[in-house]
């Protein structure tokens, strides 16, 4: 299990959490898939019948349907990654081997809106984490998402699940990289309610199947090209496998890591978990051409999100976490327009945001667009925040010949996490169509989710830091609240500017080989602690005022902290630790960001071509590079059919 025990920053830092007795005990994880072999010797001890159901067969037994090719092995494989039992000399060891695991059999039949909704809403006060490694077809031309019932299940889950703390939905980002797919066209991974997880190969490269998009939050290890190691887990008929693959394998690893964090702090909300992932994910040793530093100093990539999940760092931060303030939302519509976008041209729109009640620190940003297009795949959409963070909401999709366009589609980005919403946002829509390939933007709006400023960490002995109302971050400014206080500027040109589209990683591009860049990472977990390994157990309160600020992770950090002023223009200020301590006493108009990390950069490795002749509507998300086969589960009223003579898990999410 190379992805758990390599050391040197080349694994997900799980073993240090185990050494402190954190195994996921008390957490309940359910795998939404094609069934679960509940009597598997590596799963039976941790199997939870209250977290299981057969939606396809309408009974309480989630056992998979067996056939000659073991086509329903996918869910059992995912479950073993989460909670395979320890010390039994069977297959493997689950990331959260102390957690309870269940399965929902829902992919082995008609995958309707009602089936999805029932699966997503199973026993929400008992189940903590739902892990899903499936989604719409990753063919580079499909745009699809949850229906009305499933959307309602998501909302009910995050608002009422876990007795109000919110269900945690982990989703595989997709395997459409070979077809230049974009996971922002997948309404499940594009949802603010899901924690979207991508993959990294054992050498830290972007896998050939990976989809790049701005909604990916973080990554875990999985398979790569031929010859690179894959994931070890349980398999059907009480057997084992060392060839679980794709983003299908990444999502359950993330679910297991989140279960560890829940044992450390069962009171974490669904938004707390996303904040902790953002603040602890490690970008170093992950190689991608599009790493950038956002407006508050966090490194982020369309391929890896904020980096590789770090289990021990998440556990440490969770122990001292103070629940984030209530989520607020505001929508800023652009003035009504019906703007043509001729072929070979770009339209640039600016939207001034002067007011967004309750949102001072951004989490998710959505750009809702209605666009008609002669060819949807010719569109490229980019959004730039007031703090300069530029994201690709949609990259060109060569296989997308649809004329349907987008109807109020919510393109989502997490790249501005922690930034201020105020200022000028810029939307660029590029149309690379042929002479008659015209497009028309009917309307668009920005939807911003976030909260007021907060300090979400606790003191070194586990007691919460109390900050009086007159010492909160970013004191409220006196301002006149005027509805619809925004403006829009329109700039149009028929000449297509020279741009560099970095949203889609193409590992077979020789121009990327041996490219080296230095990327700083300002880790943002400001925990006050005497030692990094004793965040909770320390009881020496006499040194409380002498304790320096350090990162929760075990990686190297610089001694410098930064602040961002609320002045106009915004300024970045370097602080030493003494200044930070003084700052905590007189918090007013600046916001602390975090210490710098410099990740190593290596040569980008090309990938071997993998042939794929089948197209799916609904499928699992795992890849087997040794067998060119696929099985499909139709999201229609048709009976699912076997497209080849191999197992379903061989190709998909």
Task: Please provide the spans of the model-predicted regions.
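Short beta-strand-plus-loop segments that form exposed binding edges in beta-rich domains
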Residues: 428-436
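Subtilisin-like peptidase catalytic core
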Residues: 11-14, 26-27, 31-39, 45-156, ...
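Noncatalytic modules at the cell exterior or secretory-pathway interfaces
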Residues: 419-429
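Extracellular S/T/G-rich loop segment that most often corresponds to the catalytic His/Ser-adjacent loop
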Residues: 33, 186-263, 267
């Amino acid at each position: 299990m190379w992805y758990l025990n390599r050391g040197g920053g080349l694994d997900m830092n799980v073993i240090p959490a185990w050494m402190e007795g954190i195994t996921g005990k008390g957490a309940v994880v359910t795998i939404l898939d094609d069934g679960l072999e509940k009597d598997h010797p590596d799963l039976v001890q941790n199997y939870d019948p209250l977290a299981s159901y057969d939606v396809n067969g309408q009974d309480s037994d989630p056992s998979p349907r067996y056939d000659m090719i073991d086509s329903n092995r996918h869910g059992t494989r995912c479950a073993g990654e989460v909670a395979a039992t320890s010390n039994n000399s069977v297959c493997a060891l689950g990331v959260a081997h102390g957690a309870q695991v269940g399965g929902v059999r829902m992919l082995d039949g008609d995958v309707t809106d009602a089936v999805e909704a029932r699966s997503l809403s199973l026993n929400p006060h008992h189940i903590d984490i739902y892990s899903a490694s499936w989604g719409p077809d990753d063919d580079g031309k499909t745009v699809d998402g949850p229906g009305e019932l499933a959307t309602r299940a998501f909302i009910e889950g995050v608002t009422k699940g876990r007795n109000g703390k919110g269900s945690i939905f982990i989703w595989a980002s997709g395997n459409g990289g070979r077809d230049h797919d974009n996971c922002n066209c997948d309404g499940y991974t594009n949802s603010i309610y899901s924690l979207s997880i991508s993959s990294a190969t054992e050498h830290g490269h972007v896998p050939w199947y990976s989809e790049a998009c701005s909604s990916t939050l973080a990554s875990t290890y999985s398979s790569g090209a031929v010859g690179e190691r894959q994931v070890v887990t349980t398999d059907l008929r009480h057997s084992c496998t060392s060839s679980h693959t794709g983003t299908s394998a990444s999502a359950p690893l993330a679910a297991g890591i989140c279960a560890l964090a829940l044992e450390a702090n069962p009171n974490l909300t669904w938004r707390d978990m996303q904040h902790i992932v953002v603040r602890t994910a490690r970008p170093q040793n992950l190689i991608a051409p599009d790493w950038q530093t956002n407006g508050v100093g966090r490194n982020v990539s369309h391929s890896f999100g904020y980096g590789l999940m770090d289990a021990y760092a998440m556990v440490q931060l969770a122990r001292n976490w103070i629940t984030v303030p209530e989520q607020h939302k505001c929508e800023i519509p652009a003035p009504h327009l019906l703007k043509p976008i001729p072929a070979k041209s770009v339209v640039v729109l600016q939207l001034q945001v002067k007011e967004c009640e309750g949102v001072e620190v951004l989490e998710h940003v959505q750009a809702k667009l209605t666009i008609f297009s002669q060819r949807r795949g010719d569109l490229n959409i980019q959004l730039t925040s007031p703090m300069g963070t530029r994201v690709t909401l949609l990259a060109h999709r060569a296989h997308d010949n649809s004329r349907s366009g987008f109807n109020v589609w919510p393109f989502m980005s997490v790249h501005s996490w922690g930034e201020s919403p105020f200022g000028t946002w810029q939307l660029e829509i590029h149309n690379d169509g042929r002479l008659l390939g015209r497009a028309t933007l009917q309307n668009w709006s920005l939807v911003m989710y976030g909260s007021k400023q907060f300090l979400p960490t606790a003191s070194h002995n586990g007691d919460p830091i109390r900050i009086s109302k007159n010492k909160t971050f970013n004191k409220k400014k006196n301002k006149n609240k005027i509805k619809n206080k925004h403006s829009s500027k329109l700039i149009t040109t028929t000449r297509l500017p020279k741009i560099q589209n970095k949203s889609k990683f193409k590992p077979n591009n020789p121009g990327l080989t041996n490219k080296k860049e230095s990327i700083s990472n300002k880790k943002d977990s400001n925990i006050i602690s005497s030692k990094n390994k004793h965040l909770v157990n320390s009881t020496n309160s006499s040194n409380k005022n002498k304790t320096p600020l350090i990162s929760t992770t075990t990686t190297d950090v610089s001694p410098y902290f930064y602040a961002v002023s609320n002045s106009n223009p915004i300024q970045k200020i370097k602080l030493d630790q003494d200044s930070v301590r003084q700052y905590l006493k007189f918090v007013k108009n600046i916001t602390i960001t975090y210490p710098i990390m410099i990740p190593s950069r290596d040569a980008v490795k090309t990938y071997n071509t993998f042939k794929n002749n089948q197209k799916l509507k609904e499928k699992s998300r795992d890849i087997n590079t040794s067998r060119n086969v696929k099985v499909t589960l139709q999201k229609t009223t048709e009976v699912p059919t076997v497209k080849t003579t191999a197992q379903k898990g061989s190709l998909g999410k």
